[in-house]
């Protein structure tokens, strides 16, 4: 376990080396340092995970105090690494999937300006995420939380010479900062009430000090939920995720599969004891997830950009995880987080291969017939798409998503179950719409398959992990998270499995019917009045950007314009202006004429006499 600090030190050192190189290194050397540091981190993580399983720590968790960061009076905080079943799972996902993404990126980014800068940012991204999942208290978790936010800004705006990319990065940074402010308020409340931010101490003290439904716990968990929805792109702070596709495609894979958007799910799962004492907020978590997954599913139906379709699918799948957390299916949420990392990384990397092969074309309707020219990318999309659609029995996504649906049913949340089933149907349609349009039909562009081990190896490994093989990896969460209500299952569970499987297959068949062939019905529907209305509404993600522009952006710009004129200074300037005006008026009386002075003297005396008589 002494190797545990190396998991984040290796990518941190890689970041420093690449930063100080200032782009002077060759691409091969930059790739060696950038990919190698994450590879060493993955090896260190593998050893830590092996040691955790072979020699289970007493109490189910291992703590390693590195140093005391701060001490003031009764307050002290240590930088301590905490490894239990939950952090072991996250450690494997972040380093394992992160390494595969880095390996693919070494091929994808060849010839790009800022090659070493890219790997410097991604190394820092991995280090920040590991800092987040290994910290034993919410303060250090928050440092990692802000670190991944900074890295997302740097990577989304990687092509900063393009104004739109810079705007997308700024949008992601600002929207997620809103959630971060809420999270900071949550930390303030928890520290004020408990005098500590150590997560394990909070989980012990909370039920001792407060009853279920306590106002302070409700406010604290609501604030933590605000932070979670910002990082994990859930309603109402979901608007940044689709625009984040402005960054390089491996960045999208890193954000969606291995790092940033899973942070909110991890936060709620890690603080499960606090949320169970605030049942109203826990129920709100499930509702937020259910609404998000349905709205994102409809938005994905009409997108034409290959990466934006996958972005909305991520929003929807994170919604399933929030739904699971909301019904108390803690294990199922983390299980789906893991399997989702496999097939979403596969889909994004495969989309990167398609984009490069098609000369950076991202509109799926300008592709077509790619299955012959790009067999590996096609296989990746078929397997990854099947896992995303939860094709029964063959894919990892089926087992994790089905567990969520069963827990929603077993806990009595039928409305959330219905939302999950609707989302499953939509997922099947938009996923295979992408596959049928891009890979079948008449070719519309020249495409050339990529070569090299850094291209095909990550895709091949992720293809295997996206099948039922990935579902065989069981997160060691026993004793870490509360046991779910519907843990056992039975005949009802098998019936639900068949129903959800049938829904997934029905969605695939409907997509084939609509998008294989001439697509006359789809064209006619798109040209109809309802089709134009809903198509435009869904294409713009239900108009949230428009709404926020009217509610927040325009008033803010108006306020900036008003303050730019410095109204306070102008208001305060009235005083000296009045004094100067009075002085100018009085100076007119000094005209050097004796008659005027005598008249003024008599007039002043008359005024004083009148005032005395009235008094």
Curated annotation (Swiss-Prot):
Enzyme Commission number(s) from the entry: 7.1.1.-
Subcellular location(s) of the protein? Cell inner membrane
- Transmembrane helix among keywords: yes
Q: Which UniProt keywords apply?
A: Cell inner membrane, Cell membrane, Membrane, NAD, Quinone, Translocase, Transmembrane, Transmembrane helix, Ubiquinone
Q: Does the keyword Chloroplast apply?
A: no
A Gene Ontology BP annotation from the UniProt entry:
electron transport coupled proton transport
Taxonomically, the superkingdom here is Bacteria
The residues that cross the membrane are: 1-21, 32-52, 63-83, 85-105, 138-160, 172-192, 210-230, 249-269, 281-301, 318-338, 339-359, 374-394, 417-437, 461-481, 496-516, 594-614
- Main location per UniProt? membrane
Record's bilayer topology term: Multi-pass membrane protein
**Pfam family of the protein (one):** Proton_antipo_M
**Family of this protein:** Belongs to the complex I subunit 5 family.
Q: Report the protein name in the record.
A: NADH-quinone oxidoreductase subunit L
Its taxonomic path starts at:
Bacteria, Pseudomonadati, Pseudomonadota, Gammaproteobacteria, Pseudomonadales
């Amino acid at each position: 376990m002494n190797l545990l600090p190396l998991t984040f030190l290796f990518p941190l050192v890689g970041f420093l080396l690449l930063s100080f190189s200032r782009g002077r290194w060759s691409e091969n050397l930059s790739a060696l340092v950038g990919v190698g540091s994450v590879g060493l981190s993955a090896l260190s993580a593998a050893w830590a995970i092996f040691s955790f399983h072979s020699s289970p720590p007493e109490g189910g968790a291992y703590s390693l105090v590195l140093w005391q960061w701060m001490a003031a009076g009764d307050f002290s905080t240590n930088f301590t690494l905490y490894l239990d079943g939950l952090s072991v799972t996250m450690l494997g996902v972040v380093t394992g999937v992160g390494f595969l993404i880095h390996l693919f990126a070494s091929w994808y980014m060849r010839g790009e300006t800022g090659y070493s800068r890219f790997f410097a940012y991604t190394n820092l991204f991995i280090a920040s995420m590991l800092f987040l999942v290994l910290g034993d208290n919410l303060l250090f978790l928050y440092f990692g939380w802000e670190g991944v936010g900074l890295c997302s800004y740097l990577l989304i705006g990687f092509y900063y010479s393009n104004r739109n990319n810079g705007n997308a990065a700024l949008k992601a940074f600002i929207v997620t900062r809103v959630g971060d402010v809420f999270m900071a308020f949550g930390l303030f409340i928890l520290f004020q009430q408990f005098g500590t931010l150590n997560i394990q101490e909070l989980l012990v003290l909370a039920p001792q000090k407060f009853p279920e439904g306590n106002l302070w716990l409700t406010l604290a968990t609501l604030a933590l939920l605000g932070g979670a929805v910002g990082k994990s792109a859930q309603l109402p702070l979901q608007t940044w995720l689709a625009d984040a596709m402005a960054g390089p495609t491996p960045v999208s894979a890193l954000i969606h599969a291995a790092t940033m958007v899973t942070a909110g799910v991890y936060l709620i799962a890690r603080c499960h004891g606090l949320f169970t004492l605030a049942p109203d907020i826990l129920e709100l978590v499930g509702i937020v997830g259910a609404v998000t997954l349905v709205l994102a599913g409809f938005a994905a139906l009409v997108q034409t950009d290959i990466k934006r379709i996958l972005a909305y699918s991520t929003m929807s799948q994170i919604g399933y995880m929030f739904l699971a957390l909301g019904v108390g299916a803690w294990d199922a949420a983390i299980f789906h987080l893991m399997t989702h990392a496999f097939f979403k990384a596969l889909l994004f990397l495969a989309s990167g291969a398609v984009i490069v092969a098609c000369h950076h074309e991202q509109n799926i309707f300008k592709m077509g017939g790619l299955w012959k020219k790009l067999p590996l990318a096609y296989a990746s999309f078929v397997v990854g798409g099947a896992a995303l659609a939860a094709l029964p029995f063959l894919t990892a996504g089926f087992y994790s998503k089905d567990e969520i649906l069963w827990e929603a049913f077993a806990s009595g949340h039928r409305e959330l179950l219905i939302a999950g089933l609707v989302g499953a149907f939509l997922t099947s349609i938009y996923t295979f719409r992408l596959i049928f349009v891009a890979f079948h039909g008449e070719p519309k562009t020249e495409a050339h398959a990529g070569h090299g081990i850094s291209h095909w190896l990550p895709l091949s490994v992720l293809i295997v992990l996206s099948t039922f093989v990935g579902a065989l990896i069981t997160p060691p969460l026993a004793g870490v998270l509360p046991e779910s209500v519907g843990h056992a299952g039975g005949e009802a569970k098998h019936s639900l499995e068949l129903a959800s499987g049938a829904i997934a297959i029905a969605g695939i068949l409907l997509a084939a019917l609509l998008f294989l062939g001439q697509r006359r019905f789809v064209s006619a529907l798109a040209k109809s009045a309802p089709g134009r209305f809903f198509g435009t509404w869904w294409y713009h993600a239900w108009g949230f950007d428009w709404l926020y522009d009217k509610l927040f952006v325009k008033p803010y710009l108006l306020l900036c314009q008003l303050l730019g004129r410095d109204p306070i200074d102008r208001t305060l300037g009235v005083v000296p202006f009045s004094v100067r005006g009075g002085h100018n008026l009085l100076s007119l009386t000094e005209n050097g004429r004796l008659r005027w002075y005598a008249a003024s003297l008599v007039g002043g005396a008359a005024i004083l006499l009148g005032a005395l008589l009235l008094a």
